[in-house]
């Protein structure tokens, strides 16, 4: 069990490191009661906001592959702001995820990025500068996330950032790309 193994490590290394337990979670309004129960049951230290789907993964496609229209961008913005305003999350992971599939950083992207960043700044909610796709971007000679235009807006709006890797597999952390 994930949490149980981390509790064991917390105890084992309590005099050497401070180990926190958290999960990346969606903002799905219909499941908030369940999510709050999970947080209580497992005594999680925090949860991270990952905005991958609009309100549910049962009806809406993944933003990272399917944000190709202004309508999808607007759904991304709406759920991003709702999730941030929920007060549940410690920070917003990869807030520029829509740029994994949106064709170019156009005026629509600028507008929703400004709205997202202003909300994050107002709430004092950090945004994750996710370097987990840097090696992919480099290998394919493209720019997805972290997207420099989004982060210019985040800086201009006075956002706080936290650096993350989004390592779904620990081998991602062992990639020499990130250490050279």
What are these regions (language model features)?
Residues 87, 91-95, 99:
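Active-site groove signature of glycoside hydrolases
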Residues 1-74, 78, 171-174:
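A metal-dependent hydrolase metal-coordination microenvironment
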Residues 3-16, 36-45, 82-88, 115-124, ...:
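Acidic (Asp/Glu)-rich catalytic clusters
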Residues 54-61, 79-87, 126-133, 162-169:
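Low-complexity, flexible helical/coil segments
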Residues 73-80, 89, 113:
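Hydrophobic, well-ordered secondary-structure segments
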Residues 99-100, 104-180:
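Charged catalytic cores and adjacent phosphate/nucleic-acid-binding surfaces used
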Residues 19-23, 47-49, 91-93, 127-129, ...:
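Hydrophobic faces of well-ordered beta-strands that scaffold small-molecule active sites
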Residues 58-71, 97-107, 137:
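Surface-exposed cleft-lining segments at the edges of enzyme active sites
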């Amino acid at each position: 069990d994930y949490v149980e193994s981390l509790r064991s490590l917390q105890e084992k290394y309590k005099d050497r490191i401070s180990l926190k337990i958290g999960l990346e979670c969606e903002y799905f309004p219909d499941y908030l009661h369940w999510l709050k129960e999970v947080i209580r049951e497992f005594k999680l230290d925090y949860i991270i906001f990952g905005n991958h789907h609009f309100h549910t993964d049962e009806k809406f496609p993944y933003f990272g592959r399917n944000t190709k229209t202004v309508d999808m961008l607007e759904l991304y913005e709406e759920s991003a702001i709702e999730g941030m305003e929920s007060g549940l999350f410690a920070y917003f992971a990869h807030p520029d995820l829509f740029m994994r599939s949106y064709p170019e950083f156009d005026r629509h992207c600028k507008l929703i990025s400004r709205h997202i960043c202003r909300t994050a700044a107002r709430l004092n909610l950090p945004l994750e500068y996710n370097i987990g796709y840097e090696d992919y971007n480099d290998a394919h000679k493209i720019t997805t996330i972290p997207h420099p235009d989004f982060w210019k807006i985040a800086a201009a709006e006075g956002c706080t950032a936290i650096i993350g890797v989004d390592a779904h597999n620990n081998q991602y952390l062992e990639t020499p790309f990130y250490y050279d």
